[in-house]
Design a protein with these regions (language model features):
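Glycine-enriched, solvent-exposed interface loops adjoining structured elements
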Residues: 1-231
């Protein structure tokens, strides 16, 4: 965890050192009138990174309903087809995409490969009758259900909050914030420098993904319903 105060201090000593964002009389400190802007850009960067990389994951249970093949993954369906847990609440605003799902004995299934489990939209699952029958037989005599593992956005932070990123992606976040702040300062020089920082951001996350420096690549895991407090 990185306190936002520490993150902003690193920006002040680094990419934003010679900009109006830094207090002239107190080097290493973001000027109070620009603090809110830096916080807003940081949250924007956290959304960008957490939608590009599966940094934060959640899980929710889906119980099949008779003669229903399409299941929207929304808060409106909690208590009917969807069940979350007190320690892992499902929120529409945090949902990014389905990663995979697990049947009642913990076997992993992926989406959009065989045609049996599809995502017609980013937050909707569609199952063939054959796949629902398979899950029903696996769960029998209990009701047919599966556990869905999904990617979540980074929570919005406050000025006293913490950033939850792998160490290598903190640099990426610094580059993202600096690129947008400097670009917004106006003028061709600032625009060019902002573009340069954004290009560096894209290179950095590209290398991170290619080399899996932040260990964000997906691996198969077993996840039975008895785990993690789900009923």
């Amino acid at each position: 965890m990185i306190p936002f105060n520490s993150f902003s201090q690193r920006l002040a000593f680094g990419q934003l050192k010679n900009t109006s964002a830094v207090d002239e009389d107190n080097l290493g400190v973001i000027c109070p009138k620009h603090y809110g802007t830096i916080l807003s850009l940081t949250n924007q960067g956290l959304v960008d990174l957490s939608t590009r990389f599966p940094l934060i994951k959640g899980q929710v249970d889906l119980t099949f309903v008779l003669n229903q093949n399409i299941y929207p993954l929304t808060q409106a369906n909690l208590g009917t087809s969807l069940t979350d847990s007190p320690d892992d609440t499902f929120l529409d605003d945090e949902f990014v995409k389905v990663l995979d799902l697990f049947d009642a004995i913990g076997d992993r299934h992926v989406v959009n490969t065989s045609g049996h489990i599809l995502t017609p939209s980013f937050n909707t699952l569609r199952f063939t009758d054959a796949k629902i029958t398979e899950f029903t037989e696996i769960a029998s005599p209990d009701p047919a259900r599966i556990r869905i593992r999904y990617q979540k956005k980074h929570p919005t932070i406050t000025s006293t909050g913490n950033i939850n990123l792998p160490p290598n992606l903190e640099t990426a976040l610094q580059l993202f914030v600096a690129s947008l702040y400097i670009s917004h300062m106006g003028g061709p020089d600032h625009s060019a420098k902002g573009d340069s920082y954004y290009a560096a951001y894209l290179r950095h996350i590209g290398e991170d993904e290619m080399k899996d420096l932040s260990s964000t690549s997906e691996v198969e895991e077993n996840d039975k319903f008895t785990n993690r407090g789900f009923v």
